[in-house]
Amino acid sequence: MASPAFAVNGMFTPVKLSGSFTASMPVDSKPAASATGVRMVVDPLQRKYQSIGKIGVDYSRPKKLATYVRSGYSVGMEFPNTPSMAGHYSLTDCDKAGGAAKILMKYDEYCAKGMLQVGKRAACRTGVYTTKCTEGTQPQMAFDVRVFNRTQAFRQAQKPVAARLREQYEARKACFVLAHNCSREEAQFKEMPMSCATFLASKMEATGACYRTVRPTSVAEDYMAGSVRAQLYTKLNPKGVYGVGACEDGHAKGDADQRRVIALASEYRAAAQSPSTVTGQQYKSAQLATQLFAHDCHHEQEQIYEYPAVAAAMCRY
C-alpha cells in the first residue's frame, strides 16, 4: 500500500522512508525554510579585495537609517594652541550650543587654523626658521614657547566677559578695515570671532609688523616707540597689576626671565636679516598702522612713515 486511504493531500507532511523493508515515499519538491534566514554568501576573493566596512555585514537584515553611531562629541572644539583662538565661545552661561551653532563653531575653528597656517607659511617660506621666528631660534626653545602659548590661551579664556567682548569688537573693526570693502569678507568676520583674531595675528606674523623685528634707527624713534608700548601696557593694566591672561612675560616662576631673554634675542637677531627684509617689514608696519590708526590724519601719517618702529609698536596685537 503506497499511502493511507484516508490521507488528504496537505493534511500531513510526507516523510521520506528508505530501507530494506519499506519503499521510497514521494518527497515534496518545495525546500523547507531556514529558521535563521537567508544570508548572502561572499566569495573569498571578493572578501579579500572589498572594503573593510563591508566585511561581516548581515545582508539579510534591512538597512536602517542613522545606524552609524560615533562615540564622542562630533563637532566639539579642540583646545586652542594660540591665545587668538581662545575665549570666543564661552561668553554665556549656557555651555550647550545648538546643532547649527556647533557646526558653525567648528567651521570657524577650521578657518582660523587655515589662516594661521597661511601666516606661518608666509613667515617661513622655505620651511626653515628664520631670525624673526616667534617659536624660537635655539634648540628646545620652540617647545617652551608652545607650552607658554597654550597656557596663555587657557588664561585668555578666563578673562572677564567685558574684556573679551571689547577685544572681539576691536578685532572685528580692524578686520573690517583690512577687508577693503569686500562684503564676503565682512560677513565672515562678523560671524566668526575666532577667525577675526587669528587673521590679525597671522597677518602681523607674516608681514613682520612687530616691534621685536622692526628696530628703531634713532634715539627719537626709540623713545616714541617705547612711549607707545607704555600706553598699550597702561591700557591693558590700568591699575598697574597684571590680571589673568594680561601678562605676556609669564605666569609661573622663571617664565618672565625666560621670556625677556627670548625677546632680547629676537631683537638682536632681527639685525641679522637682509636689508630687503628689513625694508619690507618697515613698509608693511607703516602701511598697517596707516590703515588702522592714522584716521586720515596727514601729521600722523608722516610720523608713521618716518618712524617705522612706532608703527610696529602700534600694530602689536
Swiss-Prot record:
Chain sites annotated for binding phycourobilin 3: C297
PTM info: Contains four covalently linked bilin chromophores.
Binding-site list for (2R,3E)-phycoerythrobilin: C210
Binding-site residues, phycourobilin 2: C133
Main location, first listed in the record: plastid
Localization (cell): Plastid, Chloroplast thylakoid membrane
Domain of life the protein comes from: Eukaryota
Keyword hit for Repeat: no
Sites where the protein binds phycourobilin 1: C94
Lipid bilayer topology: Peripheral membrane protein
Any one Gene Ontology BP term: photosynthesis
Alphabetic keyword roster: Antenna complex, Bile pigment, Chloroplast, Chromophore, Electron transport, Membrane, Photosynthesis, Phycobilisome, Plastid, Thylakoid, Transit peptide, Transport
GO cellular component: chloroplast thylakoid membrane; phycobilisome
Transit peptide: 1-40
Biological function: Critical for the incorporation of phycoerythrin in the phycobilisome complex.
Subunit relationships: Heteromer of 1 alpha, 1 beta and 2 gamma chains.
Protein name: R-phycoerythrin gamma chain, chloroplastic
Source organism (scientific name): Aglaothamnion neglectum
Source taxonomy: Eukaryota, Rhodophyta, Florideophyceae, Rhodymeniophycidae, Ceramiales
